[in-house]
Amino acid sequence: EISVRPFCFWPEKPGLGYITVSGFTLRQAAPQWATPTAFQEGLIGPHWSKGWIIENNHIYESKSVGISLGTPIGTGHATVRGKHMKGGTQREQEVILRALHTGGWHKDRVGSHIVRNNVIHDCEQAGIAGHMGGAFSQIYGNRIYNIHHKRLRHGAEVAGIKLHAALDTQIRENIIYSCYRGLWLDWQAQGTRVSRNVFFDNLSEDLFVEVCHGPYMVDHNLFLSLMNFRNMSQGGAFAHNLFAGRFVVQSELTRTTPYHFPHETAVAGYSNITGGDDRYYNNVFLGDNDPNKEPVPITFFEHLPLKPRDKAGENDGKPVMDGVPDDAVCWL
C-alpha cells in the first residue's frame, strides 16, 4: 500500500482564510518534507492564510507533516539547490525577508489560527509544523504521539510540534509523548507561551528552544522524559514546571537570527545567541540518582524579592513582552 495524494484538505492558493475544519478523520497522505526554506506541505493546512480553526479531528498517517501552518512556494522553494549554495542561516533569513516584502507576512493577513482538541499520530516528520504561518496562533488541547516513530527518513524538522517564528503563539494543555522530540521552537520564539503541557517518553528531548532571543514563557508544564530541555536561546522565563530529566544549555555564536518589534512581524534586528538572560522561578527539579555525577554550577538562576501586595505593579504576576529581546522582563 502506498500513499500518492499530497494532501487531504488544502486550499489550492494562499489567502483563503477563516475556514473551520471540525470532526473529520484525515489520514493517508504523502506531503513532501517541509523545511522552512521551501513550500511547507502537510496533510491539512491553511496554506498561508489567516484565522483557520482546525478542531476535533483525528489526523494520522502522513508521510511528513500532519498539520502544516507553514510557508507557501512564493517565499522560496528548495533554495538549497544550485552550484554555489548559501548556508542555511542565510537562506532562512532571505525567506523571512521575502515573506515580509512580497509574501504578505503580516498579522492582518497570515496566522492567528486555532488548532485544538485534535488527535495527531503516526506522522513521520511532525504532528504540527510551520514557519511564520503559525504566528499569533493558539495550539491547545491536542494529543500528539508516535511522531517519527517508524524512522522512515530523518531530518532537522522532526518533533511533535515544530514551529519557526511562533510570535505571540500560545501552546497550552497539550499531551505530547512517544515522539522523537516533543516541542521544538526554532528561531523567533518571541512573546511565545508554553503552558500546562505534559511531555513524556520523548526520545531526544521534551523541549528544544533554538536560536531564539525571547522573551518567551514556559510555565506549569510537566517534563517527564529522560532529557527535558535543550536550551540554545536566551530571554526565557521558566516558572512552576516539573523537570524530571536533564538539561543542556549552550550558546550559539555562529548564527545570527532576527528579533521583532513587539507583537508584529517587522524585524527589529539580528543577533547571535550569547546565552543567559533566563529566569527560573518556583520549579521542581528531580535528580536522576546517578551517584557518579558531579554537581554542575548553575549561574543563571535569579530570584527577585517579593513585593507586598499593596505595592505590586500592574504587570506583577504576568509576563511583560512589550520590549525588544534584550529588554526582556518577567515578574512572577
What are these regions, as identified by a protein language model?
Residues 57:
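P-loop NTPase nucleotide-binding module
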Residues 1-23, 27-31, 50, 64:
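Extended acidic/polar, glycine-enriched regions
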Residues 54:
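Catalytic cores of enzyme domains
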Residues 9, 31-47, 60-332:
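Glycine- and acidic/polar-rich repeat regions and solenoidal domains
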